[in-house]
């Protein structure tokens, strides 16, 4: 399959001369959690359902579930911390094999490079402070992952759950965008934002390295109008780009940490509201238990995060 491009009208994608609708499933945690048997079963099932893209976090998802398949992405220091100057080839061999299996089934890998907990100056940096990647290692890390995965024609999602609250964080993401476009100029780029966010720093709006907008309408029961409100906000920006709701409410996810869970009707409603309000380039779907790759009897590592978000401890 050919590379994905932006349409001349700059509001949808094109591949092999035909319109390409981005229909992604969210499986952030597969590189650390899934066995290869599970992964191949999943790929066949999602292909049968009609999905054509997969959203994956390159580094370990902080709120994944526990797994016996976990491998650290960096070599360890004598104290057990990550050595950011030494990437773990075993981890990336496994990750690349999983991407290869997905691409053989015609999936587009949408790979997140820097989730906010790995970036200094973000709200997420308080979650795993020992795993913040120093800025001096960002260029070499991004060069490595682009070299590893670029041949599979991925979409690179440069950020994860970010809200650009500091100049430090902005520097990380600008550096990552520049490296991606320098190393893989034909790969599309976007940014996964914190739920409800639509105000991007002007430097990103004007950047030639950002190819399309992605927003998150999120998992708050009281704020489900964000599915169409954010689409309209992005559609009104001065620089026109395709728009995707990359994280509508997940099926089975709690109502923002409150009692009750989103069902399939809620998900369909959020997606249709997004598409009909300007986010017409595509959408993602997420199922609770799949994005964090949960196995019965294992611990949910995100329980602590939900509690802290509700109390404001991390914000």
Say what each PLM segment does.
Residues 55, 72, 244-245, 283:
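Structured core elements
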Residues 147, 182, 236-237, 276:
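Solvent-exposed polar/charged
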């Amino acid at each position: 399959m050919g590379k994905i491009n932006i349409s001349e009208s700059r509001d949808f994608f094109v591949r092999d001369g035909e319109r390409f609708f981005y229909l992604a499933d969210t499986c952030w945690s597969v590189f650390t959690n899934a066995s290869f048997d599970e992964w191949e079963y999943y790929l066949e099932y999602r292909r049968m359902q009609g999905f054509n893209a997969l959203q994956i976090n390159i580094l370990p998802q902080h709120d994944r579930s526990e797994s016996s398949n976990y491998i650290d992405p960096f070599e360890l220091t004598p104290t057990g911390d990550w050595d950011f100057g030494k990437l773990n080839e075993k981890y990336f061999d496994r990750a690349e094999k999983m991407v290869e299996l997905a691409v053989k089934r015609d999936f587009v890998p949408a790979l997140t490079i820097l989730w906010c907990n790995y970036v200094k100056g973000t709200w997420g940096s308080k979650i795993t402070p020992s795993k913040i990647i120093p800025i001096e290692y960002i260029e070499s890390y991004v060069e490595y992952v682009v070299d590893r995965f670029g041949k599979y024609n991925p979409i690179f999602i440069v950020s994860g759950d970010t809200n650009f609250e500091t100049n430090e964080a902005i520097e990380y993401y600008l550096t990552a965008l520049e490296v991606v476009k320098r190393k893989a100029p034909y790969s599309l780029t976007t940014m996964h934002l914190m739920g409800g966010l639509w105000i991007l720093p002007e430097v990103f709006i004007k950047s030639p390295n950002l190819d399309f907008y992605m927003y998150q309408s999120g998992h708050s029961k009281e704020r489900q109008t964000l599915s169409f409100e954010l689409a309209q906000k992005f559609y009104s920006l001065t620089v026109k780009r395709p728009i995707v709701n990359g994280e509508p409410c997940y099926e089975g996810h709690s109502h923002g940490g409150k009692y009750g869970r989103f069902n399939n009707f809620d998900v369909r409603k959020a997606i249709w509201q997004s598409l009909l309000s300007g986010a017409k380039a595509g959408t993602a779907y997420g199922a609770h238990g799949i994005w964090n790759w949960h196995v019965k009897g294992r611990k949910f590592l995100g329980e602590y995060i939900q509690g802290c978000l509700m109390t404001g401890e991390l914000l």
